[in-house]
């Protein structure tokens, strides 16, 4: 009897500025990141400078509505932490000659947590505050912004776990010199769980002081729209917690039998049944039965072919059967998704 145990633990911390390839590609070759005096140059890939100058910028929460990629890099702090833990256990034991028992167990757990912080100096934060400011285009009167001044913190976490448990019997034997038989049969049980949470955005966030502010009119709901600075209907981003949970369970029964005579002629049969927690009122729809039969002729070992020098290997094989996978992306029943939101006033 032999046994083995393997454990794996990984952790990866990553910190980036969140600058995308798109931001680089939108930067014209002639544009500078810094002026000669060391101040930030205005990059033109977001708003037209001439149009901005027509607005009463001095009345807005942020009179500086310009974008600069270097300023974004310095003002962002995007952190991601990924952890993975895996345990694998194996056991193999011989029962009688040619017959052995094989057991495999694996458990794996992973998590991914992110915190994206855009400081008050970033265009992302300043643009949100200004864009969500009440504005009368005719009188150029500026009202209250629905988002408080300060940085923006976005965070969330995804957790994934699974286990796989397999029991299998293997049989291999040869007898009477010309007969070979191999067979296996087993059962495999598995479960996959995924849980994800996206937290509400934290507005007016100051990383150094660890303080934040609540929007003056509350977060509202995901359908509570209003007119933003540009006169378009808008809702406050990240006002609600998003939560998801999924559990997939599977069980499989399988067998495979092969027979070879004189090393030339072979036959095989395999069958498998895959079941899952598929949403259905008909239990038969939760199972996917599959099978196949096959035959093989090793022509290369026949006497009439051995004298042909340019043929050193030749097999003729034929199989027939039904194959596939458990389908869980749809259902014969009407599925309902339920969500909720909080309307803060």
Set out the residue ranges of the language-model regions:
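Surface-exposed loop/interface segments of Gram-negative outer-membrane beta-barrel transport/assembly proteins
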Residues: 2-84, 102-104, 108-249, 278-284, ...
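Extended, hydrophobic alpha-helical segments in both membrane/secreted and soluble proteins
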Residues: 103, 251-257, 265-273, 288-297, ...
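Conserved catalytic-core segments centered on acid/base and nucleophilic motifs
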Residues: 91-95, 255-271, 276-284
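An active-site-proximal beta-strand-loop segment
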Residues: 242-246, 254-259
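Residues on the lipid-exposed face of transmembrane beta-strands in outer-membrane beta-barrel proteins
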Residues: 1, 87-93, 167-171, 255-261, ...
């Amino acid at each position: 009897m032999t046994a083995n145990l393997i454990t794996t633990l990984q952790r990866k911390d990553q910190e980036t500025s969140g600058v995308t390839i798109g931001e680089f590609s939108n930067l014209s070759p002639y544009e500078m990141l810094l002026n000669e005096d060391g101040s930030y140059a205005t990059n033109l890939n977001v708003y037209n400078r001439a149009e901005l100058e027509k607005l009463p910028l001095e009345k807005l929460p942020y009179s500086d509505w310009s974008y600069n990629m270097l300023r974004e890099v310095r003002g962002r702090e995007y952190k991601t932490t990924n952890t993975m833990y895996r345990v694998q256990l194996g056991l193999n034991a011989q029962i009688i000659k040619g017959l052995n028992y094989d057991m495999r167990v694996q458990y794996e757990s992973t998590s991914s947590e992110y915190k994206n912080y855009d400081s008050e100096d970033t265009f992302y934060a300043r643009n949100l505050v200004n864009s969500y400011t009440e504005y009368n285009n005719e009188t150029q009167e500026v009202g209250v912004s629905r988002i408080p001044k300060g940085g923006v913190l976005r965070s969330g976490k995804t957790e994934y776990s699974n286990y796989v448990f397999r029991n299998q019997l293997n049989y291999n034997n040869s007898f009477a010199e010309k007969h070979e038989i191999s067979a296996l049969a087993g059962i495999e049980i598995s479960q996959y769980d995924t849980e994800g949470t996206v937290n509400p955005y934290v507005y007016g966030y100051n990383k150094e002081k660890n303080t934040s502010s609540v929007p003056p009119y509350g977060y509202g709901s995901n359908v509570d729209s209003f007119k933003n600075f540009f006169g378009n209907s808008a809702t406050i981003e990240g006002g609600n917690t998003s939560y998801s949970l999924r559990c997939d369970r599977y069980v499989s029964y399988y067998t495979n039998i092969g027979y070879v005579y004189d090393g030339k002629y072979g036959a095989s049969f395999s069958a498998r049944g895959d079941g899952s927690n598929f949403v259905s009122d008909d239990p038969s729809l939760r199972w996917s039965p599959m099978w196949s039969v096959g035959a093989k002729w090793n022509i290369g070992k026949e006497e009439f072919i051995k004298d042909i020098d340019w043929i050193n290997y030749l097999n003729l094989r034929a199989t027939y059967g039904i194959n596939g996978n458990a389908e869980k992306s749809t259902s014969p029943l009407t599925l309902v998704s339920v969500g909720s939101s909080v309307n803060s006033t």
